[in-house]
Amino acid sequence: MKAVVLTLAVLFLTGSQARHFWQQDEPQSPWDRVKDLATVYVDVVKDGGRDYVAQFEASALGKQLNLKLLDNWDSLSSTVAKLREQIGPVTQEFWDNLEKETEVLRQEMNKDLEEVKKKVQPYLDEFQSKWHEEVELYRQKVAPLGAELREGARQKLQELQEKLSPLGEELRDRARTHVDALRAQLAPYSEQLRERLAARLQALKEGGGAALTEYHAKASEHLSALREKAKPALEDLRQGLLPVLENFRDSLLAAVDEATKKLNSQ
């Protein structure tokens, strides 16, 4: 039941921290989110790509060409994994520095979110109570029909469905009414939160124009440092890819040459 209320609440208050705002868990850092998403994406692409390569090599054409793509794929995966290990600490340092520079702004925004949460919580509790009452009322109306079905024969199934249909529609309509009422109650607070966030940014822009410039300058500085520190790792990646590409090129040329000889001999 609480999941329903939490889901509805997120519909009215947006933002990157919304899901953490209504929960007790600490939000992930930006680096953790990026790292998790990148890891999942790379793993899916790597595993899926290896499966396709393995299927191709197992085919008649793959056996005939004998390109040894799977060996090259494993070498490439190993090189990419090494790159991730080398760049990981550098990227972590970048996010740590950026979070440190924006700590004050994030604290002010979290304070606004917490204040709005306290104001809207009574409306969420009221909605949860009403929703529970509606579900309980629906359960009471449906219970006799279930007993009737158990006691009756199969031919009563259609009759039961006809009786359940209006009850389901009634529950849906009543739930929609409560949702609309909740939306109307939360709308002022949602607008208030948006106005506060806009005011924070406007204050930074006007009275704290220097602060925004400083944020931009420090972010650019951190990005430049990230690029410089990542150069050795990227160069290692390039050097690691060269043998793989050369091996693939030689295998492909040999396969084409062999196929040409077979065609000429026929």
Swiss-Prot record:
UniProt-listed Gene3D superfamilies: 1.20.5.20, 6.10.140.380, Apolipoprotein
Major location category of this protein: secreted
Any Pfam family: Apolipoprotein
GO BP terms, alphabetized: acylglycerol homeostasis; cholesterol efflux; cholesterol metabolic process; lipoprotein metabolic process; phospholipid efflux
Posttranslational mods: Glycosylated.
Alphabetical UniProt keywords: Cholesterol metabolism, Glycoprotein, HDL, Lipid metabolism, Lipid transport, Lipoprotein, Oxidation, Palmitate, Phosphoprotein, Repeat, Secreted, Signal, Steroid metabolism, Sterol metabolism, Transport
PANTHER family hit by this protein: APOLIPOPROTEIN, APOLIPOPROTEIN A-I
UniProt function note: Participates in the reverse transport of cholesterol from tissues to the liver for excretion by promoting cholesterol efflux from tissues and by acting as a cofactor for the lecithin cholesterol acyltransferase (LCAT). As part of the SPAP complex, activates spermatozoa motility.
Family in the record: Belongs to the apolipoprotein A1/A4/E family.
Protein name stated in the entry: Apolipoprotein A-I
Gene assigned in the entry: APOA1
